[in-house]
């Protein structure tokens, strides 16, 4: 009987042997170039970047010089991308045509003449944004680029008719 218990005990010890195996798991992510436009209201259809508002006044020939407008700094659109991503910004001629560096605001009143205006890339209004000419750049290491638009109406020789003058631009950003 002692022999049977010893043999049975050895079976329990031999049956409790554990086997082990080691495996590897590769972990990875592929970061691709991409961008997203932030800082503007979201809605259905075409996104709205903001309003270039030249304000109100009876004349456009005042002693203070040209009228200026800029997208509001509180909501200025910005392109966020992987660093070193190339991008282009293009602004069309608007609803009322535009040639070279000049675009036009059209009045709602009958017989109102269009008012010429120009767009610029900088607050000093020295670097123009010509009609349908792409402006190229590269995203800096910060991964963020402001997309400012500045406008200017030069003093007019004629007093314009009373009206609300407006234009609608299409801004295309590609990367």
Predicted segments — roles?
Residues 15-18:
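N-terminal signal peptide c-region/cleavage motif recognized by signal peptidases
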Residues 20-104, 109, 137-175:
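N-terminal small/polar-rich segments of proteins
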Residues 1-7:
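Bacterial N-terminal signal peptides that target proteins for export
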Residues 113-118, 129:
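Extracellular/luminal ectodomains and secreted, surface-exposed scaffolds of diverse proteins
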Residues 125-132:
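Short beta-strand and strand-turn-strand segments in soluble, beta-rich domains
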Residues 123-125, 175:
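Solvent-exposed strand-loop boundary residues in beta-sheet-rich modules
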Residues 7-10, 119, 167:
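Sec-dependent N-terminal signal peptides
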Residues 92-94, 118-122:
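Predominantly extracellular/luminal cell-surface or secreted proteins
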């Amino acid at each position: 009987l002692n022999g049977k218990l010893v043999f049975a005990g050895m079976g329990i010890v031999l049956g409790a042997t554990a086997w082990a195996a080691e495996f590897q798991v590769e972990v990875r992510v592929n970061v691709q170039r991409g961008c997203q436009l932030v800082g503007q209201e979201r809605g259905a259809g075409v996104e709205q970047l903001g309003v270039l508002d030249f304000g109100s006044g009876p004349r456009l020939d005042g002693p203070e010089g040209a009228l200026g407008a800029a997208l509001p700094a509180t909501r200025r659109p910005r392109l966020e991308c992987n660093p070193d991503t190339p991008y282009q910004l293009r602004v069309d001629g608007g609803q009322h045509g535009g040639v070279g560096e000049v675009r036009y605001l059209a009045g709602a009143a009958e017989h109102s003449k269009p008012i010429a205006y120009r767009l610029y890339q900088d607050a000093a209004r020295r670097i123009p944004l010509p009609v349908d000419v792409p402006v190229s750049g590269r995203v800096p290491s910060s991964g963020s680029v402001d997309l400012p638009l500045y406008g200017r109406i030069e003093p007019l020789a004629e007093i314009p008719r009373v009206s609300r003058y407006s234009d609608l631009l299409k801004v295309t950003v590609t990367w």
